[in-house]
């Protein structure tokens, strides 16, 4: 497959050229015909070639720029991940965003950030002007390794690589482990940007229903046996969007299945610092064998400070480091220095303690107000930002979201998180962004509008 791709890129195979027959190429390469068929199908999924029934495989015509909107199922804009992300990011400062995934700036340790910036400004020039090392700032990697150990995950600093964000961490892993057309498992529901990112990698997605204690184990086994996926992306600490946490029993069963089917798991742990006490981590039970653990500081520190990390086996870190150099060279040293300065200060621990209490109160208060409107939380989360809620009377969340957006309130409809499109009556609420009474006034009006459409 690599040879054919290189010949297409080098124009020794031109657009429209017919490829060798399956049997002919198998004989030339001394491989099975099924191996050639699989390779051709991957190239078809990639868009490099196409098949003509009864005629064979041909090099595709000149490629057009990739439009992620056109990759996969076409969705109503109200539940399209890109549309929701743009609405949240482009919203005016005074717009209400109960559907977004981050804390209000007033809930973040801004004073600690200012203090850290002053400290860095007084430091030597390298912190302000130099590239970071390929793995990232050693002091921060040492600190991350110690923090992971508190959650039961054993990793040396050399098994930790800094990234620009949690999203970049997943992107690099996908670049290393996936070929176009590979199958990836996701939870249903799951964080909608997982779907967007996997579209960019032209992966085939299969979803597994998520329960209050983790993925449905029987359906996970069925999906593994039927689809033989390369990866499974999930949250174990605090699940997005449901707020659920993985139970120890389910964690062990997931890892047993991963071992049986040769599955690699990406454990997205960007909400770890919201927890009062650590939930089970797949990376802790697995010892970072089949599990790749990622984290970020955007949620509790600052979305403007782009810094995340990957913790994995040493051989995988080696390959990921090469990819990082190829795609972003040395990485951002200033962000790493800033994160280290804030995390090393006792003020960050106090910030987290206060933040957890504040979120706990917000989950309680927001949940009670939503129930008055007939909007019921799916479960009562132990920690975190989110309430995953069912609308009354089977109302369509997309209709409610459109009505709310007309009143400058951005909501997150359930089917944006559901690959199977099975969450049409759900909304995800960020409790830290749902404290303004105007949200509930608009919700009440939007519910009435949606009822009128039924």
Please tell me what each predicted stretch does.
Residues 357-367, 377-390:
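Conserved glycine-rich beta-strand-loop-beta hairpin in the small C-terminal domain of fold type I
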Residues 26, 31, 312, 388-394, ...:
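Conserved PLP-binding active-site segment of the aspartate aminotransferase-like
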């Amino acid at each position: 497959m690599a040879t054919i791709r290189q010949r297409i890129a080098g124009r020794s195979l031109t657009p429209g050229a017919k490829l060798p027959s399956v049997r002919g190429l198998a004989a030339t390469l001394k491989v099975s015909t099924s191996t050639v068929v699989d390779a051709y199908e991957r190239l078809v999924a990639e868009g490099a070639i196409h098949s003509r029934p009864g005629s064979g495989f041909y090099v595709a015509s000149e490629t057009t720029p990739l439009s992620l909107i056109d990759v996969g199922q076409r969705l109503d804009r109200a539940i399209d991940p890109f549309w929701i992300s743009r609405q949240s990011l482009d919203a005016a400062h005074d717009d209400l965003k109960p559907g977004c995934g981050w804390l209000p700036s007033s809930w973040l340790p801004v004073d600690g950030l200012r203090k850290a910036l002053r400290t860095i400004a007084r430091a030597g020039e390298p912190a302000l002007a130099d590239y970071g090392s390929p793995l990232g700032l050693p002091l921060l990697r040492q600190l991350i390794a110690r923090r992971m150990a508190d959650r039961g995950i054993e990793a040396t600093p050399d098994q930790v690589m800094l990234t620009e964000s949690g999203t970049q961490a997943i992107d690099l892993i996908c670049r290393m482990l996936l070929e176009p057309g590979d199958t990836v498992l996701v939870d249903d529901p799951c964080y909608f940007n997982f779907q967007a990112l996997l579209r960019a990698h032209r992966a085939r997605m299969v979803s597994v229903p998520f329960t209050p204690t983790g993925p449905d184990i029987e359906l996970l086994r069925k999906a593994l046996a039927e689809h033989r996926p390369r990866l499974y992306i999930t949250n174990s600490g605090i699940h997005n969007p449901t707020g659920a946490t993985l139970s120890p029993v389910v964690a062990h069963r997931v890892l047993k299945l991963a071992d049986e089917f040769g599955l690699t798991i990406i454990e997205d742990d960007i909400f770890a610092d919201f927890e009062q006490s650590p939930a089970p981590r797949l990376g802790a039970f697995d010892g970072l064998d089949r599990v790749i653990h990622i984290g970020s500081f955007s949620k509790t520190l600052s979305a403007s400070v782009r810094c995340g990390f990957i913790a994995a086996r040493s051989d995988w870190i080696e390959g990921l480091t090469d990819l990082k150099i190829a795609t972003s060279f040395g990485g951002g040293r200033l962000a790493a220095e800033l994160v280290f300065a804030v995390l090393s200060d006792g003020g960050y621990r106090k910030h987290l303690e206060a933040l957890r209490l504040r979120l706990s109160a917000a989950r309680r208060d927001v949940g009670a107000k939503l129930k008055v409107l007939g909007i019921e939380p799916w479960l009562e989360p132990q920690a975190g930002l989110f309430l995953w809620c069912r609308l009354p009377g089977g109302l369509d969340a997309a209709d409610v979201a459109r009505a709310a957006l007309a009143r400058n309130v951005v909501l997150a409809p359930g089917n944006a998180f559901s690959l199977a499109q099975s969450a049409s009556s759900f909304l995800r609420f960020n409790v830290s962004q749902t404290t303004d009474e105007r949200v509930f006034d608009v919700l009440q009006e939007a519910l009435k509008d949606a009822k009128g459409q039924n």
